[in-house]
C-alpha cells in the first residue's frame, strides 16, 4: 500500500508543479486569448526546440506565398522569472504577386507571421504560454538536433 501511495505521489508531482506554475501567468486581457503548451519530457531537452506557428486560416490562391506582419515579444514575469510570449497585434497580410487564373477556386491555408521561425527553448517542467489577439491560432511543432555532428573542412 505504501508503495502504491508513493507511486501516486511521484506521478502526480509534475501535474501539481504545472498547475502551480500557471499561477504566474495572468489570464488573457480583453480581446486576447491565452494558449498554453505543455511539452512531454525528453531525455536530452537541450537538443530539442519548439517552433511556434502563429497565424490564421484564410482563403487565398494556391500559387502565392503569404504572411502576416507582427512582432512576437518575450517578457519575463516579474517575481517568477518565467517567460511569456505576446503577439499584441496581427498585422496586415502580405504576399507575392504572381498572376493566377481567376477561375481557379481559392483554398483555405494557414498563414503565419512572416520572418524567421520562432524557435523556443524546450522545457518540460514549464509551460509555454502565448498571448495572441482573439481569432489568431497558435500551432507548434518540435525540432530535434541530430546526434551526428559533422566536421567542416578547412579551405
Regions found by a protein language model. Name each.
Residues 29-31, 44-46, 79, 122-124, ...:
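Solvent-exposed loop and beta-edge segments used for protein-protein assembly and interaction
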Residues 121-155:
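C-terminal partner/receptor-binding element of secreted or periplasmic proteins
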Residues 7, 34, 82, 125-128:
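Short, surface-exposed beta-edge/turn micro-motifs
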Residues 1-4:
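Positively charged n-region of N-terminal signal peptides that target proteins for export
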Residues 17-61:
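N-terminal export/targeting and maturation segments
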Residues 46-115:
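Mature extracytoplasmic domains of secretory-pathway proteins
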Amino acid at each position: 500500500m505504501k508503495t502504491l501511495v508513493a507511486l501516486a505521489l511521484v506521478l502526480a508531482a509534475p501535474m501539481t508543479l504545472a498547475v502551480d506554475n500557471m499561477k504566474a501567468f495572468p489570464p488573457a486581457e480583453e480581446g486576447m486569448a491565452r494558449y498554453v503548451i505543455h511539452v512531454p519530457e525528453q531525455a536530452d531537452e537541450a537538443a530539442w526546440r519548439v517552433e511556434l506557428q502563429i497565424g490564421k486560416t484564410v482563403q487565398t490562391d494556391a500559387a502565392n506565398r503569404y504572411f502576416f506582419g507582427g512582432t512576437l515579444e518575450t517578457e519575463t514575469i516579474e517575481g517568477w522569472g518565467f517567460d511569456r510570449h505576446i503577439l499584441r497585434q496581427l498585422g496586415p497580410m502580405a504576399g507575392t504577386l504572381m498572376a493566377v487564373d481567376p477561375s481557379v477556386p481559392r483554398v483555405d491555408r494557414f498563414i503565419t507571421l512572416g520572418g524567421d521561425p520562432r524557435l523556443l527553448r524546450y522545457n518540460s517542467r514549464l509551460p509555454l504560454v502565448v498571448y495572441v489577439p482573439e481569432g489568431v491560432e497558435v500551432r507548434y511543432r518540435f525540432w530535434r538536433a541530430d546526434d551526428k555532428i559533422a566536421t567542416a573542412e578547412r579551405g
